[in-house]
Amino acid sequence: MLTLKQISKHYNPGSVNELCLFRGFDFTIEEGEFVSVVGSNGSGKTSLLNIICGSIDVDGGCILVNGQDITGQKDYVRQRKIGRVYQDPAKGTCPSMTILENMSLADNKGRHYGLGKGVNKGRVSEYREILSQ
């Protein structure tokens, strides 16, 4: 389960360009739940994912994975618990590879980080159908 509790994030705090992105934001994804994050340009979708993955630090609140606080953990520690698959593989970490090939990295190169647990090759056609909708 992924839980965000009372997340707050401001860009350019204290300046005339200050932007409050999140204030007291709560969000929970139950184990096995499939979630889509949708919204207009600039609404915070990418920032939310970057906060979850640790690319952007939060100003307040905490991020829990299965009840364990991962807020502020180093990237290599957080990567053992959470990762992402890009909607458009051309913008992902290996743009020349298909989505399946990108996911297979978790089975191979990511195995020592514990990333392979989320990839089930037996469900490839199901993943493909979900992602094509």
Residue ranges of model-derived segments:
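The feature captures the beta-strand-to-loop junction immediately N-terminal to the Walker
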Residues: 38-40
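ABC ATPase NBD coupling module
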Residues: 69-83, 91, 113-121
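Conserved ABC ATPase "signature" region
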Residues: 118-133
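Pre-Walker A (P-loop) beta-loop-beta motif of ABC nucleotide-binding domains
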Residues: 24-36
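Conserved structural motif at the start of ABC-family nucleotide-binding domains
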Residues: 2, 22-24
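Conserved ABC transporter NBD signature motif
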Residues: 61-69
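Helix-to-loop junction immediately C-terminal to a conserved catalytic motif
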Residues: 53
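Q-loop/switch helix immediately C-terminal to the Walker
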Residues: 96-112
